[in-house]
Amino acid sequence: MKSILQQPIWRYYDQSISAKQRSPLESFATDDTLCQLVGQLVSPPTIRTWVHEASVVLGIQDHRLPYVQQGMDLLESRGYQPIVRNSGGLAVVLDEGILNISIVLSEQMDSLSINDGYDVMVDLVKGLFPEVAEKIEAYEIVGSYCPGSYDLSIEGKKFAGISQRRLRQGVAVQIYLCIEGSGSQRAALIRDFYEESLQQEETKFNYPQIVPEVMASLSELVDLHLTVEGVVIRLQQLLHRLAGEVHPESFHDEELTLYGFYLKRVFERNAKMLERHE
C-alpha cells in the first residue's frame, strides 16, 4: 500500500445511497467542488463513494456519432438514461450494481503525475480486495467499453475503469467498479448503442469494437459474496486502517455555495452540448 493513501486525515463523503436517484451530472459537480476544496487545502484529502440508477454517460466523441440520437433512444428504450458530459472519455454504464469511488488529492504541496494518480487508485482497489489482490492487473482490455491503459481486470476480464479530473490544484481520480450483475450484459448494451449510432458509417474517430465477453463484474470473477453495500463497508474499514482520523462529512453551507456554482456550470455545458446536436 503506497504511503499516499496513508493520510493523517481522510474526509469521507458517502453518497452510495443518497445519489442514486440524482443525475450523474450532480456527481461531476461534486467532484469538481472537492477538487477545488482539496486542491486549495480548504478540505483534507477526500474519498467519495457514489452510486446512480441506470444511466449511460457519454463523452464528447460519443456525442459526435452520426446517428447518436437513435443510439440515445435505444438506451432509453432499455431503461438507461443517457447523459452527455463535456469531457473526453467514452461511454460508460452506471447502475445500482456499480460502485464509483473518487479519491481527491491536492497538488499544492507535491505534484502528482498522471500515472501516480492511477497507481493510487489501483493500490486502493487491491487494498479493498486483499483476497484477490495478486490477480488484479492494470492494462488496456481491448474489446471493452471506454478502454484505457489502467483498465482493471482479473484473468483478462475487465471489471473497472479509471479516469482523472484536474482542477484548481486538485486531482480527482475516479473509478467505476462493477460489483454486482452481468458485466457482459452492460458491455452488450454499449455495443448496441455504438451499432445504432454508427449504422456502419465510416468516421474519423475509431470507436471501440466491443466484445461483451471481455467484461465481467467482480461477483462473476471471484469466489466471494460481494455487494455494493458490502464493498462500501470494506472501504470504510480500510480507511480507518490507513488514516489517523476519518471524518465522515457531506458539504457544509459554504461548500454548498461553491457546489451550486459547479452544478450550474455542469448543467449549462450539458445543455449546450445537446443544443449543438439538435
Curated annotation (Swiss-Prot):
Gene Ontology molecular functions: lipoyl(octanoyl) transferase activity
Keywords for the protein's UniProt record, in alphabetical order: Acyltransferase, Transferase
PROSITE patterns (alphabetical): BPL_LPL_CATALYTIC
SUPFAM superfamilies xref list: Class II aaRS and biotin synthetases
Keyword Transferase: yes
Gene name of the encoded protein: lipL
Annotated protein name in UniProt: Octanoyl-[GcvH]:protein N-octanoyltransferase
InterPro entries: aa-tRNA-synth_II/BPL/LPL, BPL_LPL_catalytic, LipL, Octanoyltrans_LipM/LipL
Family, per entry: Belongs to the octanoyltransferase LipL family.
Residue ranges occupied by any BPL/LPL catalytic domain in the UniProt entry: 41-247
Reaction it catalyzes: N(6)-octanoyl-L-lysyl-[glycine-cleavage complex H protein] + L-lysyl-[lipoyl-carrier protein] = N(6)-octanoyl-L-lysyl-[lipoyl-carrier protein] + L-lysyl-[glycine-cleavage complex H protein]
Site (Lowers pKa of active site Cys): K158
Cited function: Catalyzes the amidotransfer (transamidation) of the octanoyl moiety from octanoyl-GcvH to the lipoyl domain of the E2 subunit of lipoate-dependent enzymes.
One matching Pfam family: LplA-B_cat
